[in-house]
Amino acid sequence: MLLPTQTSWVILAGGQASRMGGKDKGLVELNGSPLIQYVINKLSQQDVSITINANRNLDSYQAFAPVVSDSFPDYPGPLGGIHAGLKNASTDWVGFVPCDSPQISDDLVERFCAAVKEDSDILVAHDGEFKQPVFTLFHKRVLPKLEAFLERGDRKIILLYKECVTEYVDFSDAPNCFVNLNTPEELTQFGTLQ
């Protein structure tokens, strides 16, 4: 079985945050702490190294963890961050989570590691109803395929998953761990619920 220490994890914070009014989502505060701090706290308990993918406010993010930026222009979405994370990783297996999901499961890394098969390229979380495409674990061997995918202008992460050996990791018992906060209204509502 793959061990958590044999993986590294990248928090995706490189988007444009258009639904958050352009504010950098990872740095937006929830109950006095930046959203990214919640994600870091959850991952830090799981015995993995953490990197952040960001394309602005780099100094702010570097206060939390090492930062890698997209090398493809024009914000290619989560795949740009996945590409940057894979390209700069020191491990063969690299996991990715979004910066705006404060309730990541305490055993997220362990579940992903347990689901790896010998021929797996990519593992994707599934909440029992929906695929959670940016909660994912990639093997570095996907990098050439990902680069070709991005170079031809493809941006839909689900299409890449169809080109690779993709497994799904069951989180049907913990669907709330995928709550993500995309708008100021969602942030306010979530903060009130806590």
Curated annotation (Swiss-Prot):
Coiled coil: none annotated. It catalyses: Mo-molybdopterin + GTP + H(+) = Mo-molybdopterin guanine dinucleotide + diphosphate. It is found in: Cytoplasm. Pfam families: NTP_transf_3. Gene3D superfamilies: Spore Coat Polysaccharide Biosynthesis Protein SpsA, Chain A. Its cofactor is Mg(2+). Mg(2+) binds at D100. GO terms for molecular function: GTP binding; metal ion binding; molybdenum cofactor guanylyltransferase activity. InterPro entries: MobA-like_NTP_Trfase, Molybde_CF_guanTrfase, Nucleotide-diphossugar_trans. GO terms for cellular component: cytoplasm. CDD domains: MobA. Its main location: cytoplasm. GTP binds at L12, A13, G14, K25, N53, D70, D100. Signal peptide: none annotated. Its EC number is 2.7.7.77. One of its GO terms (biological process) is bis(molybdopterin guanine dinucleotide)molybdenum biosynthetic process. Belongs to the MobA family. The N-terminal domain determines nucleotide recognition and specific binding, while the C-terminal domain determines the specific binding to the target protein. NCBIfam families: molyb_mobA. Transfers a GMP moiety from GTP to Mo-molybdopterin (Mo-MPT) cofactor (Moco or molybdenum cofactor) to form Mo-molybdopterin guanine dinucleotide (Mo-MGD) cofactor. This is Molybdenum cofactor guanylyltransferase. The gene is mobA.
